[in-house]
Swiss-Prot record:
Catalyzes amidations at positions B, D, E, and G on adenosylcobyrinic A,C-diamide. NH(2) groups are provided by glutamine, and one molecule of ATP is hydrogenolyzed for each amidation. Pfam families: CbiA, GATase_3. Belongs to the CobB/CobQ family. CobQ subfamily. Pathway: Cofactor biosynthesis; adenosylcobalamin biosynthesis. This is Probable cobyric acid synthase. GO terms for molecular function: ABC-type vitamin B12 transporter activity; catalytic activity.
């Protein structure tokens, strides 16, 4: 009882569609798990057993009310720049590869992915498979282990998702189906039109046109909605407009920014802007340097753009500066690379904390943690015990000063500069409230507290899809599926 969700392009809503279907199915008592054979993302999540997967698959697992597992995302590609990506295989670092070399390994990786899928089927019964990017990338058909080659092996019913907000939805859908290989085209059993602005009934003639053109039923027209769910990739950063608010926070949009979902709770209560290196930091109440897949290269980008100097100037004016993971490493005096991170050498950090980070070998830390913040005012002392996860290479040694959390991180004497390896810190309400309360107080204001979500966002998502999706018809597709002989 499984289904494959493909898209006409990236960012059409495949991930949230899978999450919605998973939550709808589990609410109906159907055991289900998500699966994406290959994901390319710098936003990742660490499972309970220390495996690293794409954050979208973790989100989908939560929607399905199951624990995230490396089987749900057996191949994760984390771009490092210069056409190089780190390959995370079944949750653990495999190797760094050039894209051209990666394509030489797709047969091997596909075998691993198919095996992971079958393990999920055995454990959960139903699996909702998500493709990657656009399904009709004809130049990649022979090595596309997330869409076409996977579809050839699994022979699942396919539902195609298109984003009408972008325009050209008829060409998107018709063109994608027409370009699919002959043996895959008959597997397309349904179409979902996503992100419709306005009354979906106004698109009834469009639905008929699409069905006449393709011979495939449209299973739903999903109106555009905003929900508090994690974003998967940096494309979503391009959709974020400059914010206005009582308190302004600058998050440096590093070239290889990773896990920017760390700040989505802050975005609900402050004006959080993601600024490229070189953009002005004037007028911001706090500066956050986020995680990165390449600390050395992004540190050099900060220095070359003048942002490193601007951060030091802001610190001199009393603006809090916070570093998360790679950003924490940059706050130190020195970064030493044996060549495993980027290029061999010793690099000057921002010098705001007395610490040294060394990259040596290919060891990677991936672990869920719980830590107590140091009793250092005016921010950390209000956090208490927090939880999150570490995903990093390199080791950091604090030469002098205090740790920010029990046994980890660093904080300045005045408490206004601190760094930690802890991803997810500001998704903890107490931590976000501690920071926001201080920032509001500096403006002569009182922060009224983190707004509690009374309803589960996954239930809200499922309700939204159920209202506009022919779910019974879609479940029938799943139920009617019997594996065919792979081509």
């Amino acid at each position: 009882m499984s289904l494959m969700i493909l898209g006409t392009s990236s960012h059409v809503g495949k991930s949230v569609t899978v999450a919605a279907i998973c939550r709808i199915m589990i609410r109906q008592g159907i055991s289900v798990a998500p699966f994406k054979s290959q994901n390319m993302s710098l936003n990742s999540y660490v499972t309970r057993d220390g495996a690293e997967i794409g954050i979208a698959q973790a989100m989908q697992a939560f929607a399905a009310r199951v624990l995230p597992s490396a089987l749900m995302n057996p191949v994760l590609l984390k771009p490092k720049g210069d056409s190089t990506s780190q390959v995370v295989l079944l949750g653990h670092p495999y190797k760094d590869v050039q894209i051209r070399d990666y394509y030489q390994e797709t047969d091997h990786l596909l075998e691993i992915a198919v095996d992971a899928y079958h393990q999920l089927v055995e454990e959960y019964g139903a699996v909702i498979v998500e493709g990657a990017g656009g399904a009709a990338e004809v130049n990649l058909y022979d090595r596309d282990i997330a869409n076409i080659r996977l579809a050839e092996h699994l022979r699942l019913p396919i539902v195609l998702v298109a984003d009408i907000e972008r325009g050209g939805v008829f060409a998107q859908v018709y063109g994608t189906i027409a370009l699919l290989p002959e043996q895959i085209r008959p597997l397309v059993k349904g179409i979902i039109i996503n992100k419709f602005r306005g009354d979906p009934t106004l698109f009834e003639s469009g639905v008929k046109t699409l069905e006449d053109l393709t011979g495939v039923p449209v299973l739903g027209v999903i109106p555009y909605t905003r929900l508090d769910l994690p974003s998967e990739d940096s494309l979503s950063l391009q959709d974020k407009e400059r914010q206005t608010g009582l308190v302004r926070i600058a998050v440096i949009r590093l070239p290889q920014i990773a896990n920017f979902t760390d700040f989505e709770l802050l975005e609900r209560h402050a004006a959080v802007d993601y600024l490229l290196p070189g953009e002005s930091l004037d007028g911001y109440d706090c500066i956050i340097i986020p995680g990165t897949k390449n600390t050395v290269n992004d540190l050099l980008a900060l220095q070359a753009s003048g942002t490193a100097a601007a951060i030091r100037d802001a610190r001199g004016q009393g603006v809090p500066v916070i570093g998360i993971c790679g950003g924490y490493q940059m706050l130190g005096k020195t970064v030493i690379d044996d060549g495993s991170e980027a290029r061999k050498g010793t690099y000057e950090g921002l010098g705001l904390l007395d610490l040294v980070t060394t990259f040596e070998g290919y060891d990677k830390t991936t672990v869920q943690v719980q830590r107590t913040a140091a009793p250092v005012p005016p921010i950390l002392d209000a956090m208490g015990t927090v939880s999150g996860y570490e995903i990093h290479m390199g080791t950091t040694v604090l030469k002098s000063g205090r740790t920010a959390f029990a046994g980890e991180g660093a904080v300045s004497d005045d408490g206004l500069v601190f760094g930690t390896y802890l991803h997810g810190l500001f998704m903890v309400p107490a931590a976000a409230e501690a920071l926001l309360s201080y920032l509001y107080s500096q403006r002569g204001l009182t922060f009224t507290g983190i707004e509690e979500q009374n309803e589960d966002p996954y239930d809200l998502l499922a309700d939204h899809f159920e209202a506009h999706l022919q779910m019974e018809r879609l479940l029938t597709l799943c139920s009617d599926h019997t594996p065919e002989t792979p081509v």
